[in-house]
């Protein structure tokens, strides 16, 4: 029930070809182009004629965290 020798050779060559193509060097640039920098963190349809569409999105809004009165971190209530 084993594979014939010619099928093993074909499968092995196909595997080697696949691995050789997968290991090729990717063409990458060292610097960001001006085209990429023009978009920035504005909305997709940002236009100088319509400044309402150019509002930046808040990524991480400020939260003060846990206060003493909430007793959620180090304060266990024991004295």
Swiss-Prot record:
One of its GO terms (biological process) is regulation of growth. Disulfide bonds join 46-54, 66-72. It is found in: Secreted. GO terms for molecular function: hormone activity. Residues 1-28 form the signal peptide. InterPro entries: RALF (IPR008801). GO terms for cellular component: apoplast. It comes from the Eukaryota. Its main location: secreted. Pfam families: RALF (PF05498). Cell signaling peptide that may regulate plant stress, growth, and development. Mediates a rapid alkalinization of extracellular space by mediating a transient increase in the cytoplasmic Ca(2+) concentration leading to a calcium-dependent signaling events through a cell surface receptor and a concomitant activation of some intracellular mitogen-activated protein kinases. Belongs to the plant rapid alkalinization factor (RALF) family. This is Protein RALF-like 15. The gene is RALFL15.
């Amino acid at each position: 029930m084993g594979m014939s020798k010619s099928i093993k050779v074909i499968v092995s060559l196909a595997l080697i070809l696949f691995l050789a193509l997968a290991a090729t060097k990717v063409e990458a640039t060292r610097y960001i182009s001006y085209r990429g920098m023009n978009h920035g963190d504005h909305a997709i349809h940002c236009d100088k004629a319509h400044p309402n569409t150019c509002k930046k999105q808040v990524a991480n809004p400020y939260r003060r965290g846990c206060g003493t009165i909430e007793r959620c971190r180090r304060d266990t209530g024991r004295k």
